[in-house]
Amino acid sequence: MPSHFDTLQLHAGQEKTADAHNPRAVPIYATTSYVFNDSKHGAQLFGLETPGYIYSRIMNPTLDVLEKRLAALEGGIAALATSSGQAAQTLAVTGLAHTGDNIVSTSFLYGGTYNQFKVAFKRLGIEARFVDGDKPEDFEKLFDEKTKALYLESIGNPKYNVPDFEKIVAVAHKHGIPVVVDNTFGAGGFFCQPIKYGADIVTHSATKWIGGHGVTVGGVIIDSGKFPWKDYPEKFPQFSQPSEGYHGLIFNDAFGPAAFIGHVRTELLRDLGPVLSPFAGFLLLQGLETLSLRGERHGSNALKLAQYLESSPYVSWVSYPGLPSHSHHENAKKYLENGFGGVLSFGVKDLPNASEESDPFKASGAQVVDNLKLASNLANVGDSKTLVIAPYFTTHQQLTDEEKLASGVTKDLIRVSVGTEFIDDIIADFEASFATVFNGQKPE
């Protein structure tokens, strides 16, 4: 099987089947269930004694191709598609941590993730402990015998910090703690492959660069197959002790290195039900086929826009890991490839005579967003079209003011998911908006 990313995104996971029509494209298997060969075959499938399909809440042939393809792109051994990125996070964390346990993470997170960890997981009895930053020694200070995961983002949203994966993984593994990385901004493995640097589990909002066109919501969990669950039977009994739901089946024995993804699929996905539809899976497969082509343009456009903004007299600061001025630029050069990602943030200088008490929606930054014509003001990233948003008032709105600042979210921050349009048109859109807002006035 070819091993290059550009080829895998087109071919991985699709094997010739017994379909009499021999379709070249991956078919949409719009079926709820699958006919057993006989009664014994049905019993074997339900007992996890033989591989195969039972019901599309657990497995579906369309999704099977998607899962295998994403696992290949990320360097994992198995994957599980879910109904959204939030669902992927939920299953990944609850597959490791139970009531009374804790996970350790950073304040440098997407607002929806931070809120899910702080509020929703608390209701499940799972404590989330947040470090202000991403230094390995700071994470280690929060570990105890009940810590079941260290959770990071490969490119933090919205600070775009790139963690020092190798050092962080070494600290976590020293304590028998698996590392879970949300690689959404790593674009399906195109910009970043955390498993290569020791991460154990990778999640994605497949809605973003994997789908790439803003047409469907989905998520995925990828299992590296490398964490030694058998070495920690008391810490992770769900893999080493008999399963109550499968008459004593032991996941470590039944699934080997894929024990984690096997457990999440056959117990959590089965019982909680956040399944991806085959129609959505098909759309994500369509997106995957051009991922490297789009990713290259996203990355080059983002760097050029960041450089333009950094030189603009209307801009007070720019945050993009591809700029030497970014605090994590050296880590970005070490851990990112094919570019530095497709998202950046910047702040706009104040209009003359602006005051702290002014209506925030009349501030220069809000006006710049409102006067953009090509870029769309909406809550998404990874679309082929350029998108903008003010996270302080939207994606991170549920956080307290202190939590927003800890996450790197300020009132003047404008996040840009840079699309694949011609870069001169993107820059011209921002230039025209600046000219309209400032109208010949010098920024303060």
From Swiss-Prot:
This protein's GO CC annotations: cytoplasm
Location of this chain's protein in the cell: Cytoplasm
One GO biological process term: transsulfuration
Matching InterPro entries: Cys/Met-Metab_PyrdxlP-dep_enz (IPR000277), Cys_met_metab_PP (IPR054542), OAc-hSer/O-AcSer_sulfhydrylase (IPR006235), PyrdxlP-dep_Trfase (IPR015424), PyrdxlP-dep_Trfase_major (IPR015421), PyrdxlP-dep_Trfase_small (IPR015422)
Molecular function GO labels: cysteine synthase activity; O-acetylhomoserine sulfhydrylase activity; pyridoxal phosphate binding
Cofactor(s) in the UniProt record: pyridoxal 5'-phosphate
Catalytic activity: O-acetyl-L-homoserine + methanethiol = L-methionine + acetate + H(+); O-acetyl-L-homoserine + hydrogen sulfide = L-homocysteine + acetate; O-acetyl-L-serine + hydrogen sulfide = L-cysteine + acetate
Key words, A-Z: Amino-acid biosynthesis, Cysteine biosynthesis, Cytoplasm, Methionine biosynthesis, Pyridoxal phosphate, Transferase
Described purpose of this protein according to its UniProt entry: Catalyzes the conversion of O-acetyl-L-homoserine (OAH) into homocysteine in the methionine biosynthesis pathway. Also catalyzes the conversion of O-acetylserine (OAS) into cysteine, the last step in the cysteine biosynthesis pathway.
Similarity remark: Belongs to the trans-sulfuration enzymes family.
NCBIfam families tied to this protein: OAH_OAS_sulfhy (TIGR01326)
Protein name listed in UniProt: Homocysteine/cysteine synthase
